Amino acid sequence: MPTREELAEVAALAGMQRALALYRLGLRTEASTEWLWTVRKMNDRALLAAAELARVNGIWDRVINTADRTVAEHDFTLRYPEPYGNVLSKQARARKLDEPLVFGLVRQESRFISDAKSSAGASGLMQLLPSTARRIAMIIGMKDFNKSRLGRPEVNAALGAYYLRHVLDGFGGNPVLAAAAYNAGPGRARSWCDAKPLEGAIYVETIPFAETRQYVKKVMANTVYYAAVMGGDQRSLKSRLGTIEGAMAMKADANK
């Protein structure tokens, strides 16, 4: 944890003050550029102070990305923070989801930016497409849904948790396949299964889409770290990756 003096020293930097001012004005792109330039040559202690400053100001992507830059001294509560903890934990429990998996997925999807938008049109903490969100809202009886509400953490988490539960159920509760499906679609995740069972790590390495391959790796690694930070299930990454069923068994499960 950075000292009060270290925090004050980083907060006094002109570049940091400009970055924070830009964030307050809602100029996220310009603010991020200024932030990155300011922290580019910082040592570990200064980086942790900058990450803590971002945490105090609720700039969660900078908290994570800045803490991730340290080389020898690490603070995993900054690398793996728990913003919107009550909202996300409530929905995880409601859908019987592993909380570290939910936080690990959100960390990768949006870096906890509640109004994040992707180039593909996905929105919010759990990066839902409006069409998917609208369909889920109808299923769960969410009234007066419109896509502008996807920026509200409680709405996005409720819809996203339902969808994550849906893809998990479609793959026998396997988080590796669920993560692949969440990113690339259930059909693709299923088509990448081998005829015979294989180790989860091998399945991940054979995903043909580089983006999805890296996404699954990061979500699963995030899950392990969040479990450690949150005091949950301490299984290793290898254990969590598990074994992927063969394609025929997968097809049979899908038809049940």
Which residues fall in each region the model found?
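Catalytic glycan-binding domains that act on GlcNAc-containing polysaccharides
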Residues: 1-9, 15-18, 25-256
